[in-house]
Amino acid sequence: YYQNIIETANYIIKYFNEPIDYAVVLGSGITLELEDQQELGYEAIPLFPGNKHANRVKGHANKLTFGKISGKNVLVLNGRLHYYEGYSMKDVAFMTYVVKHLGVKGLFITNACGAINTNFSEGDIVCLDDFINGRK
């Protein structure tokens, strides 16, 4: 497992050929505009657990996008694997470990969430303190 993480990180570093300052994981339907962007589909990444099966979550582009924001190199993970899709927790966490081995200074994770609080509007920033695991 660890060797696959290292090999995947090395593949991404070689593919984009620039240091990566920050990484962002986008949730369903969320986009991010980058300057000078390049893309790499998950299916093209050797050893990536998600390249064997199509991700079934609507709104996930299933690709890495590399580019710049305010002069900083940013890697965007457009979609991720989910435990409820039948992936193991190791598979779900795989790209987070890869990002760590890319040497980024920070990782920002977004998601689409539902709430019962009627004061929330689309696009609000919320802090999750609990969730429902529908896969028990």
Give, region by region, the residue ranges found by the protein language model.
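Proline- and acidic/polar-enriched loop/turn elements at helix boundaries
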Residues: 79, 111-112
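Non-catalytic positions within long, well-ordered alpha-helices that form the structural scaffold/packing
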Residues: 99-103, 108
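C-terminal binding/interaction regions
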Residues: 92-93
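Hydrophobic/aromatic beta-strand patches that form the interior of the parallel beta-sheet core
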Residues: 75-77, 108, 126
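Phosphate/pyrophosphate-binding betaalpha-module
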Residues: 113-136
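N-terminal short beta-loop-beta anion/metal-coordinating cradle
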Residues: 1-88, 133
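N-terminal cationic-hydrophobic initiation segments that often serve targeting/anchoring roles
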Residues: 13-16, 100, 117
